C-alpha cells in the first residue's frame, strides 16, 4: 500500500488542549498500571448522590464473567446531563434541532430541557411507568427523542431505542425480547423529504400475538398526518404533558442499575440486547467526549448519527450533555435537499466539532466539490469518523475538502458493546496517520492474538483484536441471556474480550483496524483484510465505493470477489475492467487482484450505513435461499438487483 502521510499535532490545538502527548502518556500509563486509582479519581467527572468506595470488580473468567464498576455509588443520569448545569449555564443552548427541511430549526436551553424532561417524566409516571420498567422508543430525530431518553433515566426506567427505519417485524421482536411496557413514537417521521409511517408501524408491530406487555403508546405529533387511533391504548404526547407538574425529582439509581438496552443484529438468530448500566457508562461517555473531541466550553458539537444507534446515545445525547455542551440533533440526511447540506449545516450553526461516518464521507466524495458548494466551513476545529474503518483516500478528502486542512480527524474505533470510544487519536496529543485509529483511550488495554489465543508481543504485528481488561463503559450482559454474552465475547479467547475485529499494529504502536475477522481472506495462504483491498479500489479516481468478499476457489482456497460502485458519470467498460485490476495489482500486489469485478449502482447497507458483507458473501457464492436477518437493511431492493446482476455475470 502507498506509504501513509503523517500529520503532526497542530500547534493551535496543542496550545489549548485537555491532553498533550506527555499528559496522554502519563494518564494512560496510570490507567493501565493502577486502574483502581485512576478511575477512583476520574469517576468523579460525574456527580454522585452517594459517592462510591468500590471502583472495579471485574472478571473475564470462563463461566464467571462479571463486570461491575463504582457499584456502591448512586447517581442519576438526567441530573448529570441537566440539573448540574442549571446554576451556571441554564440559559445556554443544550440542543440545536435542525429539521429535514433546511427552514425548520429550533433550540432548547438547559432550563427549557429541564422543564420538558420533568414534564415528560411525570407524564410517563401517569402512564404507569415505574423504576425498572422498560420503555421502547421508536422516534424520529426530533428534540423529543432526547427528552424521552432523559425522562426515562430521570425516573429510573430502562429505555430501548429502535431505529425509526426498522420494520414492524423488527420492532415487534425487540419489544418481545425486552418486555417493554410502553412505546413512545410519533405520527410520522420525516427523512430526506419523505414521510416515515412510524405510528402505522407500531400499530402493525402490536398486532403480533407474542407482544403481550405493552399497555400504552405515547404519540408525538410531528406531521399531523392521518393515523389510526386506539382509544384506550394511545395517548398524545402534548395532552399527556399538558396537565402534569414541571418538577420531577430525579430517582436515586445504583451504579449497576440498568440504563438502556440496545439491540445489535447478530449474524445469526435473534438480535442481541446489549445491556448498559448507569454509573460506568456515564463516566465513560463523559470522559471520552471531553478528551477525544477535546471539547472546550461554548463549542457546538454535531454528531450526525441517529439516536437509534449507540453513537447517538453516547455522543449525541449523554456525552455532550453531561459535559454541558451544545449538541446538534439533525432530522435529515447529509445530501438532502442537495449534496452540500452537511456543509451548509456546519456554516449555519457554526459547528466546531463534526462527527460523522465514512459512508457519508464517501457518498459526498463521489460528488466532488458539490459537497462544499457555497460554504466555507471555517468554524470547524475538530472532525471525527465513526462506524467502520475509514480508508486513507476518504480520510484525506474529508481532511482537505470538508476541513480545509485545518481540523485534525479523530478516527474512532468502538462498538455498541463498548459503550464508548476505545481506540482513537486525541487532538492535542496524537500525530495522525490516515486510516489508523492510532492509540488506546485511558484504561483500555488492546492486544493482538493469534488464532490460538497467544498474545503477539512484537510491536509490528497483525492478529485478532482483543481487550485484556474491563473499562467502565463495557456492556454488562446480553439482556436475559448471560450465557450468550459469555459465548459471544469471551469463549473464543479465554480471559479476554474478543472484539470480532482484526487489526495490525505498526512500528509506532498505532492500531489499524482491518475489518471483521470473518472479513479476512486467505488467498493462496496469504491473509488479507478486505479493508485493505477496498481501500486500494476506492483510491482509484473513478470508484466511489467497493466491498470485497471471498468466494471458494479450487486452487487458491479463496478468490477475491469485488463489488464496485463508480462515481457519478462513470460507466463500466472493458478498458476500465482491466485498468481497475491493474490498479489493485500496483497498489497492493498481484495476490490482491480481484478475480471478479461486479459493477453495481448500490451496495446493501444497514440503516446506520454499514455494508452488509454477510449478504454480499451469500450473493457472491450463489447461496441466496436464506439470507438471514435482513430487517436492518436500508433498501432491500438492492439485494434483488445484485442477485440479478450476479446471474448475468456467470
UniProtKB/Swiss-Prot annotation:
Binding residues annotated for CoA, in chain numbering: 191-194, 311, 335, 524, 585
A cellular component annotation (GO) from this entry: cytosol
Catalysed transformations (reactions): acetate + ATP + CoA = acetyl-CoA + AMP + diphosphate
Disulfide links within the chain: none
Classification via Pfam families: ACAS_N, AMP-binding, AMP-binding_C
Protein task: Catalyzes the conversion of acetate into acetyl-CoA (AcCoA), an essential intermediate at the junction of anabolic and catabolic pathways. AcsA undergoes a two-step reaction. In the first half reaction, AcsA combines acetate with ATP to form acetyl-adenylate (AcAMP) intermediate. In the second half reaction, it can then transfer the acetyl group from AcAMP to the sulfhydryl group of CoA, forming the product AcCoA.
Protein name as catalogued: Acetyl-coenzyme A synthetase
Species in which this protein is naturally found: Vibrio vulnificus (strain CMCP6)
